[in-house]
């Protein structure tokens, strides 16, 4: 029980405890996937450990069934070796992107997400239609959206952009990530134990905001 209590900051809930108990797994620990490098992963136990897939999971033909960032998994701990992921717990939701060149194929990029920050840059990237597509996907999966207008230093008429977003009736964060502006407001939209994701096209500032949130810049 104590180990599971330590996982609450990573999003472990009483509902997950009930799922875990119902599975009746023996000699395994719950963990959350926090990084995916393809052949290897990192998991929170809550301490961060290296992990790899069991032979069964590694041979799944449907790649959506293998662990993704945000998944809760059952792991077997080994001495002086990476933990072995034996099972993926049922997902509450997932976020996927289309695979380039394939009309119907999708690639899951994150699982069990609570809040999504949809980034639009106030330069050449601003697109209400792209935002609308993101919001549709989030609504299907019951993920709470927050709009982030980044690169606010690139315009003197922010209201011209915010007026176009009034129809959505969603929180809007005005940010200039390179200067650290708006980062604290983003943090305020994330409750303890919640999982957040940054969405947006290339170049809108996802990496910069991530680094600011992690204190790397």
Question: What is each model feature region?
Answer:
Residues 38, 75-78, 90-94, 140-143, ...:
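Non-catalytic alpha-helical coupling and interface elements of nucleotide-dependent molecular machines
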Residues 101-102, 130-131, 158, 182-183:
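Amphipathic coiled-coil/heptad-repeat helices and related helical stalk/stem segments
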Residues 206-217:
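A conserved segment at the C-terminal end of the G1
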Residues 1-128:
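N-terminal accessory targeting/assembly segments
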Residues 144, 151-204:
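Canonical P-loop GTPase G-domain recognition
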Residues 62-63, 134, 186:
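Short beta-alpha junctions and helix-cap segments that line functional grooves
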Residues 108-170:
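Phosphate-binding glycine-rich loops and their immediate beta-loop-alpha structural context
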């Amino acid at each position: 029980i104590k180990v599971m209590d330590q996982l609450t900051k990573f999003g472990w809930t009483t509902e997950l405890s009930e799922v875990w108990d119902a599975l009746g797994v023996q000699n395994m620990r719950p963990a959350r996937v926090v990084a995916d490098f393809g052949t290897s992963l990192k998991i929170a136990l809550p301490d961060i450990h290296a992990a790899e897939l069991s032979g069964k999971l590694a041979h799944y033909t449907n790649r959506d069934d293998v662990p993704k960032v945000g998944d809760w998994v059952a792991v077997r701990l080994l001495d002086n070796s990476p933990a072995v992921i034996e099972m993926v717990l049922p997902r509450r939701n997932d976020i996927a992107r289309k695979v380039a060149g394939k009309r119907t194929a999708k690639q899951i990029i994150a699982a069990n997400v609570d809040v999504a920050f949809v980034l639009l840059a106030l330069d050449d990237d601003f697109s209400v239609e792209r935002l609308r597509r993101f919001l549709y996907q989030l609504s299907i999966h019951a993920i709470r959206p927050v709009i982030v207008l980044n690169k606010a230093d690139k315009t003197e008429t922010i209201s011209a952009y915010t007026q176009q977003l009034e129809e959505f009736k969603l929180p809007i964060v005005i940010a200039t990530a390179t200067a650290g502006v708006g980062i604290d407001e983003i943090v305020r939209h994330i409750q303890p134990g919640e999982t957040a994701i940054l969405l947006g096209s290339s170049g809108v500032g996802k990496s910069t905001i991530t680094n600011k949130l992690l204190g790397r810049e």
